[in-house]
Amino acid sequence: MSILALVEDRPTPKEVYNWRIYLLAAVASFTSCMIGYDSAFIGTTLALSSFREEFGFNTMSKTAVNLVSANIVSCYQAGAFFGAFLAYPVGHFWGRKWGLLFSGAIFTLGAGLMLGADGDRGLGLLYGGRVLAGLGVGAGSNITPIYISEMAPPSIRGRLVGVYELGWQIGGLVGFWINYGVSETLAPSHKQWIIPFAVQLIPSGLLLIGAVFLKESPRWLFSRGRREDAIKNLCWIRQLPADHIYMIEEIGAVDQALEEQRATIGLGFWKPFKAAGTNKKVMYRLFLGSMLFFWQNGSGINAINYYSPTVFKSIGLQGANTSMFSTGIFGVVKTVVTFVWLLYLIDRLGRRLLLLIGAAGASVCLFIVGAYIKIADPASNPTQEMTGGGIAAMFFFYLYTVFYTPSWNGTPWVMNSEMFEPNMRSLAQACAAASNWFWNFLISRFTPQMFAKMEYGVWFFFASLMVLSIVFVFFLLPETKGIPLESMDALFESRPIWRAHETVLARLREDEERFRHDIEESGYSKTGDQQVEHLSEDLPKV
């Protein structure tokens, strides 16, 4: 079987897998480039001697430096938390396309404010700019996965939402290396540290330009009663005529889902809030989605992203440039493994198995790194060169990255984008994204203090949380791979959880055969002037 082979819930014409759907996902994913770049560059920028001298870090105590650094990093996450909720009314009333434009505009304004900061003006503009930039990326982290999942065919939904994660890693790769580049090529100066801040404007500018040409989400248009526009956009995205049997099936499924929502949750801005507070099924799924981000942040990945110099110093690396270079390698490993996840793992192995394998492997690696720090105590016994034990610890650190990246890095975003019915999706994604930024804020705010107080215990702490996440996934989280968005209710109601996927997929295949049989019995055999493709081959087994 080809590495790019797809698992389909029903026979899918090859026209559906066209360049348009990938282009739309790529343009929308400039939001994740913004997020990835910021999460990667800020830690090493704060470590640049030019930045520390201009803002007086060299005259502060270590405790004060840790506090100011944590405030600079974490005010961005605080803004993102509120931005995730702000995106709900924007996405509901304005649509997904205008929500993306809103996200890019707010981020660009914040990035511009940061460029006005200097030693004379102090850190005020930096704080304000990072809060605004956080609002922008918080909104983008809500809307982008929804936009992509609502357009994607089920068989490549994981891959397309994975483009969002790929954008995150590409932005991160640039962010991890840029400070190494400026530290090697430029003398310490205002210019040296301002360049990394200025680069933030590139992905936000590309988003603002590209989003103008995006097609609005057909599912959002259906929910707003704009049926003609919805069908027109869906036909453009699928490259199929409206009377093709595949389109009839998809439009019928959307109509049926909307009718069920009218009869249960109801359509409208406030209805999801009522359901979230009174419907136990919705509350349970919100709990699952939010907990996914608790476990993701509990892996320690954002402690590494934001404070990589501190992390590598705890292992025994000496010198700012050495830490920046090691951070760059960390970014390369994450990006390469993300490609493997995107092209092969997410829609072949599925979400659930990836999370289980990733948590098991990553926890072992973290325990080993923590044990090395406990035994060797590199902070108290510094050496000019890495010892054999230190090299082994670095190996297991990068191996941790290999386990974590194709599992917990992007998969929670994929699952949260597909777990909820259309009228709940915006609010649910807002809650999930806000949950991510809340845990992200706690990690970014307290990581310096944790390393100062706990030392090797930090590694054991994150490893233990990853072990606990295995129990959570196995007993509570069903596999969502290849399941249409309109069938998620049936998936989460099926028991036992570890067999829910195969149960629902078998039911969908039966419904598909019955639908096509009814179509043939009714005499429907043409689409326009062309014969309908009666795809009779069996669906792939999962």
Curated annotation (Swiss-Prot):
The chain crosses the membrane at residues 23-43, 67-87, 98-118, 131-151, 160-180, 194-214, 286-306, 326-346, 353-373, 388-408, 457-477. Residues 44-66, 119-130, 181-193, 307-325, 374-387, 478-542 are extracellular. It holds the Pfam family Sugar_tr. It is found in: Cell membrane. Residues 1-22, 88-97, 152-159, 215-285, 347-352, 409-456 are cytoplasmic. Gene3D superfamilies: MFS general substrate transporter like domains. Ubiquitinated. Deubiquitinated by creB, probably to control its activity or amount. Residues 531-542 have a biased composition (Basic and acidic residues). GO terms for cellular component: plasma membrane. Belongs to the major facilitator superfamily. Sugar transporter (TC 2.A.1.1) family. Integral membrane transporter that imports quinic acid to be catabolized as a carbon source. This is Probable quinate permease. It comes from Neosartorya fischeri (strain ATCC 1020 / DSM 3700 / CBS 544.65 / FGSC A1164 / JCM 1740 / NRRL 181 / WB 181). The lineage of its organism: Eukaryota, Fungi, Dikarya, Ascomycota, Pezizomycotina.
